Each structure stands twice: as structure tokens, then as C-alpha cells.
Amino acid sequence: MNYTTQMDAAKKGIVTKEMEIVAKKENMNVKDLMELVSKGKVAIPANKNHKSLDPEGIGQGLRTKINVNLGISKDCYNIDMELEKVQKAIDMKAEAIMDLSCFGKTEEFRKRLIDMSPAIIGTVPIYDAVGFYDKELKDITSEEFLKVAEKHAENGADFLTIHVGMNRKTAATFKKNPRTMNIVSRGGSLLYAWMELNNKENPFYEGFDKLLDICEKYDVTLSLGDACRPGCIEDSTDASQIEELIALGELTKRAWERNVQVIIEGPGHMTLDEIEINMKIEKKLCHGAPFYVLGPIVTDIAPGYDHITSAIGGAIAATHGADFLCYVTPAEHLRLPNLDDMKEGIIASKIAAHAADLAKGVKGARDWDNAMAKARRDLDWERMFELSIDEEKARRYREESKAKSKDSCTMCGKMCAVRNMNRVTEGKDLNMLRDDD
């Protein structure tokens, strides 16, 4: 190859096979896509060692993508169950999967995940550090943290979430500006704790050039984590969040100079009225880099329903610039999600993503809705099921409550507006009282 990374290829005017695949999926000219990749406005996470990958693009002008989180924990250490979740995510066409495993030796699961998955795979190396070395967090050295990141890259992870922006300056801002929920990012809290316990700079910030060496070697996309994302609406858009975002913007430029692709991670919890400005701030401070948001969750009072609170926020966020939505399940804030929780979270996130694509005018987005409208007009139930975002649920609901007439459902019966308008426009009688028609 005459290039090191997708961005390097794009800057050299080389169209990669990954670019060709993404351009075809997005119905766009591959040269236009290449230009966006060269400028960092689109990322195509594609580790050289992820052989089963079916690449996707994330960023400006493309369909909004979704990510599914899964992974093993100390309380739920069941690799087979997590692999079932992987298959569920693949079957439901999630574009990305993040392995958030945080207990024990995680490499076996990570390798199996990457081997079987056509979806983009992301990981958070700091979660793995304690188990990787069997050492207490404070005893892990800066070089050892970087070695864990390299192992994940070597395994084939397409993007690594690293909370590089939690540096001493961001930490000082956090200390001066008390929060209700402090730091709720798992990786961010671990790094902050390590820095405080050792009185040292963030090892990934201090060793950022070495981290870029790793990313360039394997063509890993760097997902710059938001350690200071708000964990409740009271903490949103505060000094700590913005201080870190400024740092992420500076780090983005350094990464691009090395031809390393970047995604910026974002909030978090915030009220509806703050979402649009947060998207604009990120795009401004981080130079148009793709934005990856968790939600945002728009109210804190709905445990058990946070797939809904996040879908509301995600739709608004993606309408105003977010490119990548991390799914949230009904189990958020309560427990590890099961397969049913996963399905609910994926569907909610996909609805939010598609709704935003409609609002943004993404090419081809309306075709799906237009096809559904025509199927409904024609009372073509089979076609409606095929077009449904959750075909199984749509079929089950109709089967559970059968109408006497195939032309209607049990909501309206023969008073169905669609049925009656079709009949009248075709010159037919309505026959409201007869059961034989």
C-alpha cells in the first residue's frame, strides 16, 4: 500500500476499497467522500487487522450511525451471553459495537468479537488495564497504559476511546467548579483517580505522540472521550465540559497532522434547549470532526425508560450536527442490559437516527418513508411489515388483534379513513353495515 491510513490515502488522492464501499452505501460520489475524509469531516474506522469488517463512514452528509455497547463485567461474566448480544446487534444492523468489558482477561472475548463482526468495533483500553496486568490502578505505569492500547489495536479494534482531554488543566477546572454528579465517565474517572493518586499528568495526554504512532500503524480511529460529559442536567454545558472540549479540538489537529482519523465523544445529560448549541460548539471547537453522542438524555427522572429520553435527545442532536449515536437501553442506570433491553435500545436509537436524517435531508432517507406511505395507502399489510423498523413486532401486534376485514385494523374497522377514501375515489360504495364486504 502507498498509504498508512484512510486519511493519508485521501490526502494523496487514493481511493481505497473502504471508500468505494462507503460511497456506494451512501449513494455519493467517491471523490466527494475522499475529500471529506482528507479534511477529517468523515471518518472510516477500519483497522488493518479487522478482516471481517464491512466498513461504514461517520460524519458530514452521511447517514447517522448507531453504536451498541456490550461486554463482560465482574457481576455478569458470561462470554457466551455477550456473544449472543453481538449477534443480535449484527442481525439488527447496528453499524458499530463497543466492547466495554471491564473485568478479568478480556482479550479472548475481544478477539472473538472482532473475528465475527462485520460492524465497526470500538474499545476502551483503560477498562482493561487492571485485569491485563493484575495490578491496582495506581500501580500501572504510563507506558503500561499505552501498551494496553497497542494490544487492542493489534487485536483489530477499529476505534479506541481514550480520554486524552482529561489533562491537568481540565482537572483543575473540574476542582474549581463543583458538580452534582462529579465525573460519570467510567474511563474519565479512572484516569482522574490515577492522576490524583500519582500526582502525574494523564499518561495518554503526556504520551499522545506515542498513541498516534499506534493509531497510524494499525489505521485505528481515535475516539477522543469526554471524561467531563454531564451526568445530570444540572451539570450540562459547564466549565469542565467546555475546557475539555477545547483540549479535544487541539488534540484533533495534532492527530490529523499524523493522518490519524478522529471522532469526538460528547454528552451526556442535558435539557432540550441546550442540545443545538452544544452540537454547534463541538463542530466549531473541534474543526468539524464527526461527533459521537451518548443520548443526550433529556431528563433524569426516567430510569427504565432511558431509551426514550435518549432517543428524544439523539434525534435533536443528530438534526443539528451529531453524526453517531450511542444507543441507550431501558436498563441504563439500573443493570447490565439483556437481549430484550438491547433490542429496545437499538430500535429507539435507529428511529432517532433516521428521524434526524429526514430532517437533515440525507440522500435517500425519505425513500423508506415514502414506500411505507404507499403501502399504507394501498393497505398492503405484507409490504408494511417488510418496511417496518421492527418487522417482528408489527406482525405480532396485528396477529394479536385481528380485524374482520383485511382492509382495516381493530382501531377503526370499516370507519378506516384509508379504506373509505380508496373506495370513494374508486367509485365504490362504503358498505358500512354489511359484514360480507
Swiss-Prot record:
CC annotations in GO = cytosol
Entry's EC annotation: 4.1.99.17
Any Pfam family hit = ThiC_Rad_SAM
Q: Where does substrate bind?
A: 69, 98, 127, 163, 185-187, 226-229, 265, 292
Gene Ontology molecular function: 4 iron, 4 sulfur cluster binding; carbon-carbon lyase activity; zinc ion binding
Q: For Zn(2+), which residues are the binding ones?
A: 269, 333
UniProt cofactor note: Binds 1 [4Fe-4S] cluster per subunit. The cluster is coordinated with 3 cysteines and an exchangeable S-adenosyl-L-methionine.
Q: Which UniProt keywords apply?
A: 4Fe-4S, Iron, Iron-sulfur, Lyase, Metal-binding, S-adenosyl-L-methionine, Thiamine biosynthesis, Zinc
Q: Which InterPro entries match?
A: ThiC, ThiC/Bza_core_dom, ThiC/BzaA/B
User: What is its cofactor?
Assistant: [4Fe-4S] cluster
The keyword Iron belongs to this UniProt entry's keyword annotation = yes
Which residues make up the binding site for [4Fe-4S] cluster?
409, 412, 416
Report the sequence similarity comment from the record.
Belongs to the ThiC family.
Query: What this chain does, per the record?
Result: Catalyzes the synthesis of the hydroxymethylpyrimidine phosphate (HMP-P) moiety of thiamine from aminoimidazole ribotide (AIR) in a radical S-adenosyl-L-methionine (SAM)-dependent reaction.
What name does this protein carry? Phosphomethylpyrimidine synthase
| Protein source organism | Clostridium botulinum (strain Kyoto / Type A2)
